[in-house]
């Protein structure tokens, strides 16, 4: 197979129908037709995601053999984070995390304070036996910014925020006391209050856990020496882990995050009391318990959104297609070649292959 770039098309209107018309014209100029398409893929994390889904549907309606396949060049993690951000509280978490990272890393002096605080805490933890030594361990002394490109790592940002939580709190405390102006001090104080809230810490741990499950898969899909069979196995494992987390993981997750609350004296609400949504008026709010809100509206809801996205990107058909394609891999003298897979592959394109 040889890939060729055939052009860039300017579109004044980005509706699905307009995009479809633009593609039709581009293909027509090159003597090609949508009827000959055998696959399609898009950037699922962009702000055009809805339009691309509509475009995909239009093309499949005209040509059901133009199967959708996840674009491996685009990082799956960014797509899953984009999906999570459709949930208001997940979006608030990422927004607040970005603000904290920007404020704490706004100057070399603040970065130095953060580094010194974290190094001191690492030494203290090593002495107490709370953490152990080892190559590559305990080396994080700076916060990572979550990039908007495919190379960005939201998982690294969330993980470091948890690892360095105490040091970040210390830096914000310093800014509250010694900020150069009232605006800086006020901003740091607001971030500090938000950071030490139950809602933030709960959402931080939840998203770190969920993104952590999909992180290995996201990285595997981008490797140049991609092993499709291994990648599809990771997709299956990833779905299973998320489903297990949803079905049986609430108690262990809440116990884990409760330990973190205790360490930083963060008040845990009574889960049987009525949830108070500070973002909406009491007239519009439904009377639900804290347990229902955090378990059903956050824990279950965000996991379900991730599972739905994975199922949409890697459904039974395109997963089987990718596994069939893997048998054509020339590596190791076509070690993966499988005649039965090749026959199965041909069945997806009956117009191109005669009956066997």
Describe the residue ranges of each PLM region.
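Alpha-helical structural modules in large enzymes and assemblies
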Residues: 1-356
């Amino acid at each position: 197979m040889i890939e060729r770039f055939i052009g860039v098309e300017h579109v004044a209107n980005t509706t699905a129908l307009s995009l479809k018309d633009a593609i039709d014209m581009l293909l027509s100029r090159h003597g090609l037709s949508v009827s000959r398409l055998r696959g399609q893929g898009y950037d699922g994390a962009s702000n055009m995601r809805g339009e691309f889904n509509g475009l995909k549907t239009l093309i499949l309606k005209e040509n059901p053999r133009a199967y959708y396949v996840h674009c491996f060049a685009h990082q799956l993690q960014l797509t899953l984070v984009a999906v999570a951000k459709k949930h208001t509280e997940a979006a608030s978490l990422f927004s607040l995390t970005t603000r904290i990272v920007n404020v704490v890393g706004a100057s070399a002096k603040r970065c130095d304070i953060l580094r010194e605080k974290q190094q001191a805490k690492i030494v203290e933890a090593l002495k107490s036996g709370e953490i152990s030594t080892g190559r590559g361990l305990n080396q994080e002394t700076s916060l990572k910014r979550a990039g908007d490109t495919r190379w960005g790592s939201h998982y690294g940002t969330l993980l470091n925020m948890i690892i360095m939580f105490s040091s970040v709190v210390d830096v914000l405390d310093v800014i509250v006391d010694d900020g150069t102006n009232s605006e800086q001090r006020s901003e740091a104080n607001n971030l500090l209050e938000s950071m030490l809230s139950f809602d933030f810490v709960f959402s931080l741990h939840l998203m770190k856990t969920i993104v952590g499950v999909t992180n290995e898969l996201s990285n595997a899909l981008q490797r140049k020496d991609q092993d499709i069979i291994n990648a599809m196995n990771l997709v299956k494992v990833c779905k299973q882990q998320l489903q297990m987390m949803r079905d049986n993981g609430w108690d262990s997750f809440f116990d884990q995050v409760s330990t973190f609350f205790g360490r930083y004296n963060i008040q845990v609400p009574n889960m049987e009391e009525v949830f108070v949504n500070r973002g909406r008026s009491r007239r519009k709010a439904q009377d639900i318990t804290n347990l229902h809100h955090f378990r059903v509206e956050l824990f279950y809801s965000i996991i379900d959104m991730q599972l739905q996205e994975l199922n949409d990107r890697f459904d039974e058909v395109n997963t089987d297609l990718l596994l069939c394609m893997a048998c054509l891999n020339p590596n190791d003298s076509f070690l993966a070649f499988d005649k039965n897979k090749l026959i199965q592959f041909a069945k997806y394109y009956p117009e191109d292959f005669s009956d066997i």
